[in-house]
Regions:
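Catalytic machinery of carbohydrate-active enzymes
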Residues: 1-278
Length: 278
């Protein structure tokens, strides 16, 4: 979606943005993309096709291209363009400049210190940053409230994920509160171990628990938009998706820094854990 993200700059002609990475990385780039769309007449955005459904193409001039098809599809369009890329490679930067790029902005990918990653992106561009960026729903504030607690217990890797017992306890506590409450456990393609934990768990009120395995980002988004009371998960892409749909989102940070990686969104709650408390 197109929002006011900073003080207006002089309107420029063309920008080309390259963005790969995981789902969370992509969603954290949406504020920057909105700023670029507000600053350029033409924007070409190369990313994974699986992310296309998260970008509002109706507002402003934006062309979405498949990142995996490479530079060859835009060779003749680089001249005079400002380039925004997350690949910090000298040869890559030189190639873009040789093709006539105006400016090449190398944006941060994995900072371990400093400001929030979104703010760090704006700093790299020497662009004023508005704190309200943190509380916007960058995919759309589409929360529909019902009695379904959505839990995504995996997708963060062993060093990020909370123990499955933590989420089992959350689910059972929620189910005890009201007979109308129910729980959806959601699993990604790499969550085999945690899915096994789920199948082996001896839940109370198991009739009010279901599991889903979305096969695409778009399917996951559509499932969440059908209604939930709140989302619980680890520092991973699904949490960023829920938060930027306006859903009340609880993210458990175990080994990464919430000051750098917390999701943007209007209803985000952060829960910090250290190894001694788990």
């Amino acid at each position: 979606m197109s929002k006011e993200t900073s003080l207006p700059l002089t309107y420029k002609e063309k920008a080309i943005v390259f963005r790969g990475g995981g789902l969370g990385d992509f969603i954290l780039t949406l504020p920057l993309l909105a700023h670029i769309r507000n600053s350029y007449h033409e924007v070409i955005f190369l990313t994974k096709p699986s992310y296309f459904s998260l970008v509002n193409k109706r507002e402003g001039i934006l062309e979405l291209l498949d990142l995996d098809l490479g530079l060859s599809q835009i060779l003749k369009r680089i001249e005079g363009a400002d380039i925004f890329t997350f690949w910090d490679d000298v040869e890559w930067k030189n190639e873009l400049q040789d093709l006539g790029a105006n400016q090449v902005f190398i944006l941060p990918t994995r900072p371990i210190a400093g400001p929030h990653i979104v703010e760090a992106m704006f700093e790299k561009m020497n662009t004023p940053f508005l704190p309200s960026i943190f509380t916007d729903a960058w995919i759309g504030d589409d929360w529909i409230k019902n009695s379904n607690m959505w839990i995504h217990p995996g997708s963060g890797g062993d060093y990020k994920n909370m123990p499955f017992s933590f989420y089992k306890n959350l689910a059972e506590t929620w189910l005890k509160k009201k007979n109308s409450n129910w729980v959806t456990f959601c699993f990604g393609e790499a969550d085999h171990k945690i899915c096994k934990n789920f199948k082996e768990a001896n839940f109370i009120f198991s009739a009010r628990i279901k599991s889903v395995h979305p096969i695409s980002v778009e399917e996951y988004k559509n499932n969440l938009m059908q209604g939930v009371c709140e989302f619980w998960g680890n520092d991973s892409g699904p949490g960023h998706l829920a938060a930027n749909l306006g859903i009340p989102t609880n993210i458990c940070f175990r080994s990464t820094k919430s000051s750098i990686w917390r999701p943007t969104g209007p209803r985000v709650n952060i829960h910090e854990f250290d190894e001694d408390s788990i």
